[in-house]
Structure formats: C-alpha cells, structure tokens
C-alpha cells in the first residue's frame, strides 16, 4: 500500500505518522534486516553453475541529479532449474552498462542464459547461452512477409524447431519422473 495512504489510515486511528517516517522505517528495515538476507542469497546464487539474466527499463521519478524521463534499469538474475531451491534476485542500476553485470556476477563461473545484449560479454569466466524464446522471436522476425507457412524457409523451420523443443519441455514438466533423467533422454536425441 502506498505510503500516502498508510499515512492517511494511521491519522484516522489517531496516530500522526508522516510519510517520511514510514519511508525511513522501510529503509532502515531494508538496510539492517533484508540486505543481509539478500547478500546471503547473492552468495548462494554465484555458487550455481547455470544462471539466467535479463535487464529491463524502469522509470524512477525524483532520482537525484537525473531527469524524470531518464531510463534506469532493473537487472534480474535467476538460478537455473537444477533441482535446488530457486533463487531470484533483482538489482537496480541507472545505466544498462555491461559493467553492472560484471559487478553483480563477480565470482560466478558457469553458464549464463541471456538475450542478445552484448553487455554480458564483459563478464569474465562465463559461457553465454541464448534463450530459446528469444531465438524463436529472431526466427519469426526473419520470416519474409507472406512466407510464414512456407516450410522451405529456414526461418520457418527454426520456429518449428523451437516449438518442438517447447513441446518436449512441456511434456517433461508434466511427468512425475526425475526431471534431469527425462530431459537428457528427450532433448539429447533432438539436439
């Protein structure tokens, strides 16, 4: 609930608590209680052998020394499906520089699945992997106008290939058997 509404609600109960005070409480809790938890999960995330990463634009109003129309970025890093509990962490940055990924992933060594953003190439010690959903979109964009049903087109074949992989993944996810075993069995023959 927004702080201005909380301020109003508290006032109705006879407690005059300013938005500034409420915001300071949130900041204090985040710094003293949530930051250590975040740091713990960050260290655990970096121990994994496969991560996924993405960054998306966000607009932050009233950010010091920046125009309200400025674009900032929220970075997301997630553990892969490795049978361990999933870890998902977000990180804010005023820029999209690949240096942000370098800083966040410092100490990580393994596979990193991302979109085509070249900034991830700055991260040392990783092996870049592409996301099949993004690859499928690139194939769709490569299909010439009016040729989406022309199965001799390489881009149409690429879309079909991705769709087949997605169907395999979907059937795997519905199976009660060991995920790792089934995935290796089904996808190795196809890939």
PLM feature spans:
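Key DNA-contact positions within bacterial/archaeal DNA-binding proteins
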Residues: 20
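Conserved beta-strand -> loop -> alpha-helix junction used to position metal-binding or nucleic-acid-contacting
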Residues: 126-154
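RNase H-like nuclease fold core
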Residues: 10-16, 24-25, 34-114
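Conserved small/polar residues in nucleotide/adenosyl-binding loops
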Residues: 180-187
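RNase H-like DDE/DDD metal-dependent nuclease/strand-transfer catalytic core used by mobile genetic elements
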Residues: 104-135
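A conserved active-site cap/scaffold subdomain adjacent to cofactor or substrate pockets
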Residues: 153-169
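Short helix/loop capping segments that flank catalytic or ligand/cofactor-binding pockets
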Residues: 60-62, 85-87, 120-123, 139-142
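Short, charged amphipathic recognition helices of the HTH superfamily
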Residues: 1-8
């Amino acid at each position: 609930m927004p702080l201005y509404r909380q301020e109003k609600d508290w006032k109705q109960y006879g407690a005059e608590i300013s938005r500034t005070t409420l915001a300071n409480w949130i900041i204090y809790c985040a710094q003293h209680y949530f930051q250590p938890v975040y740091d713990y999960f960050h260290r655990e995330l970096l121990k994994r052998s496969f991560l996924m990463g993405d960054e998306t634009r966000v607009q932050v109003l009233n950010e010091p020394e920046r125009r309200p129309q400025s674009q900032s970025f929220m970075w997301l890093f997630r553990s892969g499906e490795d049978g361990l509990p999933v870890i998902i962490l977000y990180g804010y940055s005023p820029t999209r520089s690949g240096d942000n990924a370098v800083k966040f992933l410092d100490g990580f060594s393994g596979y990193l699945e991302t979109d085509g953003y070249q900034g991830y190439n700055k991260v040392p010690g990783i092996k870049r992997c592409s996301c099949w959903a993004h690859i499928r979109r690139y194939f769709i964009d490569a299909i010439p106008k009016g040729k989406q049903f022309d199965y001799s087109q390489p881009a149409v074949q690429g879309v079909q290939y991705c769709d087949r992989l997605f169907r395999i993944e979907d059937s795997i996810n519905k199976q009660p058997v060991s995920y790792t075993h089934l995935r290796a069995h089904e996808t190795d023959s196809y890939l």
